[in-house]
């Protein structure tokens, strides 16, 4: 069974319902129809059901739901479809980490000896944008503006929207960081965990910490 855990401050994370404005509306050309965007890409997971924890309706317990239940009307059809390459990049990275763990499990059972070096490639820019898209999805229409340039509660800045759609890039020290240390324990399972980084002095989402199939990443906005 796959897992998704969401960790936002109390009262600021949930499954959204009803017709809501597309969070990429600043790009223009919105479709008339809203789509049901998966908060976390369904293509990551091999199974149809997920174990979910940390949302408003399951704060104190783990609940099993179908992937289709973790959706929200926060993107129009056009802008949802335009993010398909980003979903693919996230799914391919997730599958790569899964394969790395599978091969490691096989080799751990073999006798000591020479091993061929196996190299893997991941679309780093695509994965960075997948994390950004997912952060926006999970924080959309919640209690804080998303990013330093946003003045609207629960909405991303225009710059972040453009980055998510490959129309811009992070500047200075903003962007995606890999978090690791020697001796760090990694539990590589089909799990995604998210916790936002919230600025208290000027309340807004400044970034997020992700555990992505056991690998820790920091996205700084």
Regions found by a protein language model. Give the residues of each.
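Short amphipathic alpha-helical surface micro-motifs
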Residues: 3-5, 56-58, 111-115, 191, ...
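Alpha-helix initiation/capping motif
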Residues: 30, 41, 123, 153-157
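C-terminal, charged low-complexity interaction regions
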Residues: 144-221
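Internal, well-ordered alpha/beta segment that forms a basic, Gly-enriched binding/recognition surface
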Residues: 28, 56-144
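An N-terminal structural lobe/cap that precedes and organizes the functional/catalytic core
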Residues: 1-89, 95
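Intrinsically disordered, low-complexity boundary segments flanking structured domains
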Residues: 21-26, 116-118, 197, 204-206
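Short alpha-helical interface elements
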Residues: 50, 100-104, 108, 152, ...
